[in-house]
């Protein structure tokens, strides 16, 4: 769910997920997808594509288990297949955001989404 996603983002980046990524550029948080503008935005684009492949559960609402072990996200073994997939999507975006912190630009924290160019396909 968005709760676990937010925790993972905070654990990996040290940033408040809602404040820093909730409206970041074209693909992070709410709103329509657009052509990714920077590496951080591309992480979010790939995450939305990952969610599109999930069937059988609601990635934004359904809770799953994971743990934080030795500064690493470990998806719970007892999660059903669908939620295991959601956990892996969320883990991947959290790691991607950490790996691309150097491209994060505070001035893009709030972006008017209609200015985004047409989206790429997944």
Curated annotation (Swiss-Prot):
Secreted among keywords: yes
Tissue/organ expression: Expressed by the venom gland.
Disulphide bridges, residue numbers: 26-116, 28-44, 43-96, 49-122, 50-89, 57-82, 75-87
Site (Cationic membrane-docking site (MDoS)): 112-113
Region (Important for membrane-damaging activities in eukaryotes and bacteria): 106-117
Sites annotated Hydrophobic membrane-disruption site (MDiS): 115
Site entry (Important residue of the cationic membrane-docking site (MDoS)), positions: 106, 109
Subcellular location: Secreted
Gene Ontology MF annotations: calcium ion binding; calcium-dependent phospholipase A2 activity; phospholipid binding; toxin activity
CDD domains the record matches: PLA2c
PROSITE patterns: PA2_ASP (PS00119), PA2_HIS (PS00118)
GO CC terms, sorted: extracellular region
Keywords: Disulfide bond, Myotoxin, Secreted, Toxin
One Gene Ontology biological process: arachidonate secretion
Family matches, as InterPro entries: PLipase_A2 (IPR001211), PLipase_A2_Asp_AS (IPR033112), PLipase_A2_dom (IPR016090), PLipase_A2_dom_sf (IPR036444), PLipase_A2_His_AS (IPR033113)
Family stated for the protein in its record: Belongs to the phospholipase A2 family. Group II subfamily. K49 sub-subfamily.
Complex and partners: Homodimer; non-covalently linked.
Function field: Snake venom phospholipase A2 (PLA2) that has almost no phospholipase A2 activity. Is myotoxic. Displays edema-inducing activities. A model of myotoxic mechanism has been proposed: an apo Lys49-PLA2 is activated by the entrance of a hydrophobic molecule (e.g. fatty acid) at the hydrophobic channel of the protein leading to a reorientation of a monomer.
Name of the molecule in the record: Basic phospholipase A2 homolog
Source organism: Protobothrops mucrosquamatus
């Amino acid at each position: 769910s968005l709760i676990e996603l937010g925790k993972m983002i905070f654990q990996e980046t040290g940033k408040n997920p809602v404040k820093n990524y909730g409206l970041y550029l074209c693909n992070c948080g709410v709103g329509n997808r657009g052509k990714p503008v920077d590496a951080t935005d591309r992480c979010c684009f790939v995450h939305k594509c990952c969610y599109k492949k999930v069937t059988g559960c609601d990635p934004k609402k359904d809770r799953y288990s994971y743990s934080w072990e030795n500064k690493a996200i470990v998806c719970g073994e007892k999660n059903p297949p669908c939620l295991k997939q959601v956990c892996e999507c969320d883990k991947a975006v959290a790691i991607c955001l950490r790996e691309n912190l150097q491209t994060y630009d505070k001035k893009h924290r709030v972006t008017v989404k209609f200015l985004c160019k047409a989206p790429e396909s997944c």
